[in-house]
Amino acid sequence: MKVKILMVCLGNICRSPIAEGILKSKLNSNNFFIDSAGTGSWHDGNKPDLRSIAVSKAHHIDISNQNARQFTYEDYKNFDHIYVMDQSNKKNVLSLAKTLEDRNKVQLILDELIPNSNLEVPDPYYDEDQGFENVFQMLDKACESIVYRFLNF
């Protein structure tokens, strides 16, 4: 049975596509299913931001085939773990939770590095290219921690 992991950000074009791509590059698709979504619907069906595609490509990860979609309650049924990028994402995702089991699936992705730190991955949308590289580095470290946890426990 596959472990199903969902990455969530605001529009599903910057942070969560990068996180999805990184985690897919580190975990075997025979044992893990990884996807991403956004809390908003503005970009439904769109490809990731060109800067997200570029920074991922610079690290040998291709996210150009991803398409943005909005997080729905069905995602609670379809995923075992839901990682959000910031407190606003967390609040929006939790607003759709119906059970304690739903709520327990949700966590800030950087809590993988420093538990209960409430650290956030900043949205690089209005930033320069370096902001995307910084986000990539944060997410790469967090995904390394996720991989370690799932493969060693």
Report the location of each language-model feature:
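Conserved active-site segments centered on acidic
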Residues: M1-N78, Y148-L151
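Helix N-cap/beta->alpha junction signal
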Residues: S16, D86-Q87
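Phosphate-binding/catalytic loops
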Residues: H81, Q87, K91-F153
